Swiss-Prot record:
The keyword S-adenosyl-L-methionine does not apply. Binds up to 2 Zn(2+) ions per subunit. It is not clear if Zn(2+) or Mg(2+) is physiologically important. The gene is rnj2. It comes from Staphylococcus aureus (strain NCTC 8325 / PS 47). Zn(2+) binds at residues 76, 78, 144, 166. This is Ribonuclease J 2. GO terms for biological process: mRNA processing; rRNA processing. The lineage of its organism: Bacteria, Bacillati, Bacillota, Bacilli, Bacillales. Keywords: Cytoplasm, Endonuclease, Exonuclease, Hydrolase, Metal-binding, mRNA processing, Nuclease, RNA-binding, rRNA processing, Zinc.
Length: 557
């Protein structure tokens, strides 16, 4: 596709998520008076986000300009690309563009959240062209761990703005996983103005091991297992799940799934023909014990840390459905993120202690779903962009990707390292980063959207680490006396029976503070409560070196 004939004036590129982090992808591209959203993903909470279910990007800037939004363009069906779509559509109206599988998964998300809203869905593929007033938009097939992944190409009068989505190059894959390198080369020859590209594995040298080689080595490893085999992987890694199904069929083992997160997406993809499953291969998890141990494979799946958590429970004999037994073999088909490394190491120790054999996870038997250094350079060389923006990674990964782009020939001054909310402006002459819009995290707790802030998280940390200390007093303000109490209650702070002296001392301190407040000309309840918080906190810290949350409760008769 050649450049559009209309001369564009202004272009703005704004990351609202997916930079400085591996998740929550969302990038805004504005061409004159039209706005396009590239991916709308979520992030699963970090350890310190106590009680938070998911995190989505702050879209206040989009809401302020919602009349300009022409569509949400999705690269693939993983949660960090589509997980925020239903939350976005609750707040505005916009058509949604994606591959057949991606659109099906979005519809399922909307149904699961009981959002009954008429949405315009457009199924697109490698040959689709969407025409707008200022731009045309086309797509190209990429390889990721889920079928029908796409890159997005916004054609402007200056050249194409290409968003790769999450990708790798693997020419051993075919069908729904095959990359269309010919189409990419055509886009590169037509002229790429800006390349926005995946940085997740920008620090990993070389190439990923081809998936056909991975499957061969997995077969060799699994064939040596004499007992029950448990494979732990993410529910979203359809390539790995298909490989396990293939190997199980060759080894005459039945397969059972353990984990609720897989059910809906797997069943949707299965009905649409994305999985090749031999007849009678799958059995319910409740029937596993009906087969000899050397005739079954259990695939423990889930999102984020769920598969590892399930293994930990199984190792400790705390799982509701099944537990690790002597002679079991376990394979973790998971690429550990930084915050998961310690958890995985601890879980492996628990599994070994429970009698399991661990099949080593190495480059021969496991590959990332993101391109390594040489694959990233290959994309840059194919596209030959004038400007380059590394995204989808921690900041150090973005920096590593920027260095690769410079090595591949992109002028260093035309490489932009961006953070959430940064605005890259192009006015027809210069590309500059000189502006910022509102951005950040929206924390979702249950059905509450954005009503959990830093203060609430701080309080949850306090409760989790140091517990809670409640002082209850009933007052007779008319006669200026304590009618009942003080009564002290604590949870998660100290073992009451071993700390009776400390609690009695705290009661006396509360009595002293309240009686002093009752002697004032004007009784100030807020001041009495604050004095209780300050002085009790000081007393408890001096005795225990801990600071529980202090809650004074004062009632009147």
């Amino acid at each position: 596709m050649s450049l559009i004939k209309k001369k564009n004036k202004d272009i703005r590129i704004i990351p609202l998520g997916g930079v400085g982090e591996i998740a929550k992808n969302m990038y805004i591209v504005e061409v004159d008076d039209e706005m396009f959203m590239l991916d709308a993903g979520l992030m699963f909470p970090e350890d310190e986000m106590l009680g938070i279910d998911i995190v989505i990007p702050d879209i206040s800037y989009v809401l302020e300009n919602k009349d300009k939004l022409k569509g949400i363009f999705l690269t693939h069906g993983h949660e960090h690309a589509i997980g925020a779509v239903s939350y976005v559509l609750e707040q505005l109206d916009a058509p949604v563009y994606g591959s057949k599988l991606t659109i099906a998964l979005i519809k399922e998300n909307m149904k699961a959240r009981n959002i009954d809203k008429k949405v315009r869905y457009y199924t697109v593929n490698n040959d689709s062209i969407m025409r707008f007033k200022n731009v045309n938009i086309s797509f190209f097939n990429t390889t990721h761990s889920i079928p029908d992944s796409l890159g997005v190409c916004i054609h402007t009068s200056y050249g194409a703005i290409v968003y790769t989505g999450e990708f790798k190059f693997d020419q051993s894959l075919h069908g729904h996983y095959a990359p269309d390198i010919k189409r990419m080369a055509e886009i590169g020859e037509e002229g790429v103005f800006v390349l926005i590209s995946d940085s997740t594995e920008a620090e990993k040298p070389g190439y990923n091991t081809p998936e056909n080689v991975i499957e061969h080595h997995m077969y060799d490893a699994f064939a040596k297992v004499r007992g029950r085999l448990i494979v732990s992987c993410y529910a979203s890694n359809f390539i790995r799940i298909q490989q396990v199904l293939n190997i199980a069929s060759k080894l005459n083992r039945k397969v059972s799934f353990l984990g609720r997160s897989l059910e809906s997406s797997f069943n949707i993809a299965r009905k649409m023909g994305y999985f090749d499953i031999p007849k009678d291969l799958l059995i319910p998890i409740t029937e596993v014990d009906n087969y000899p141990k050397n005739e079954v494979i259990i695939i423990a799946t889930g999102m984020q840390g769920e598969p590892v958590e399930a293994l930990s429970q199984m190792a400790q004999h705390k799982h509701k459905i099944m537990n690790i037994e002597e002679g079991d073999s376990v394979f973790l088909a998971i690429t550990a993120s930084a915050n998961m490394e310690v958890i995985i190491a601890n879980t492996l120790n628990e599994l070994v202690r429970a009698g399991a054999h661990i099949i080593p996870n190495n480059k021969k038997i496991h590959a990332s779903s993101h391109g390594c250094m040489e694959e990233l350079k290959m994309m840059i060389n194919i596209m030959k962009p004038e400007y380059f923006i590394p995204v989808q990674g921690e900041f150090k990964m973005q920096i590593a990707h920027a260095k690769l782009a410079a090595e591949a020939g992109v002028a260093p001054e035309k490489i932009f390292l961006v953070e959430k909310g940064d605005v890259i402006n192009y006015n027809g002459k210069d590309m500059i980063l000189n502006e910022k819009v509102n951005s950040g995290n929206i924390l979702i707790d249950g059905i509450g959207i954005g009503d959990v802030g830093n203060i609430v998280l701080r309080d949850r940390h306090l409760l989790a680490e140091d517990g809670i200390f409640i002082a209850v007093v009933t007052l007779d303000p008319k006669n200026r006396r304590i009618a009942a109490g003080p009564e002290i209650q604590s949870r998660g702070f100290v073992y009451v029976r071993e700390s009776e002296d400390l609690l009695r001392e705290a009661e006396e301190k509360v009595r002293e503070i309240v009686e002093a407040g009752l002697q004032e000309k004007r009784i100030e309840w807020s001041e009495i409560k604050q004095n209780m918080r300050d002085q009790i906190s000081k007393l408890l810290f001096e005795s225990t070196k801990r600071r529980p949350m202090i809650i004074p409760v004062i009632s009147e008769i």
